[in-house]
C-alpha cells in the first residue's frame, strides 16, 4: 500500500546543494524501492536533466543492494549521460556509475567528501574499513580525519564526540552531513555529487581514488569461535606486521598505501576480511595471506 508523504525534504536538501548551472545529464536507478520520487525530484530541482529507471514499487531489473549488484541496466543507460545513481530501497546507500562503469562504494563517499571540502567542512569521521584514498584526499586538502568502528551508528557517535560535521562508511557508499541529518543519506549525496561532476576536482579526485584497490570478503565460522579465532590471529598478525590496531577487530597498516582489517560480523556466522592497496597484485596477496592466517587460527583453537 502506498501513501503520499508531505515533506520539506527536497526543498531543504536543495538549499544545501545550491543551483547547478551546467545541467548534468543523470540517470536515477530507484531499484523498485520506497525512496522512489525523491531522488528524481531533488535532482531536477537543483538543475539536472534526469532519466529514471526501476521506479515502479517492488519491480526492478536488479537486486536491492546496489553495492553488490552489477547494475547492468544502469550501466547501459549511463553510457551517453554524465553519471548514474543507484539507490538501495530506503535511499541511504548510493553507488555511482560513470562512463558505463560501476564505481566502488568508497568512491561515492569520496565524492561526497570532495563537495564537503568545497563547502568548507574540515572535520571528517571515516569507518575503519573505508578506503585510505578518502583519508589521504581529506588530509591533502586541509581536513582532519578521525576513524570509528564500522557501522553507521558508530560513525555518527564519533562525529558527535569529535565535533565532526561530515562522516561516512566506504563499504556501504554511505555519506553523512550533520548539518542536514545524522544518518547516511544517498539522496542528498546524489545532489551534492551532481553539483561537482563537471568540475576539475571531480575528475582529479576520481583519478586519485581509482588508483586504490579494495577487497572485502568473508569466511564462514560459527560465531562461538570468533573471539578465540581473533585472539589467536592477533598474535600472528602482530608478529607479521610489528603492530596492529584494535579499535574494531584487528587492523594492520602494511605500508602508507596498504592495510588489512579482520573483524567478526555482528549479524552472521562469518569473519570479515578487508584489504586495500594501490597495487592490485599486492592487495590480492595480502588478502589471501590473512585469510590463510584466519584459517590457521581456527585450526589452532578448534
Question: What are the language-model segments listed below?
Answer:
Residues 54-58, 107-110, 149-154, 171-172:
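Short, acidic/turn-prone active-site loops that include or flank metal/cofactor-
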Residues 81, 120-302:
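Phosphate-binding and adjacent anionic-ligand microenvironments
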Residues 1-79:
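Gly/Ser/Thr-enriched, mixed-charge loops and adjacent short helices
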Residues 37-41, 63-66, 94-99, 134-140, ...:
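Short acidic, glycine/serine/threonine-rich loops at helix termini
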Residues 32, 89-93, 172, 279:
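Short, glycine/acidic-enriched loop or turn micro-motifs at the edges of active sites
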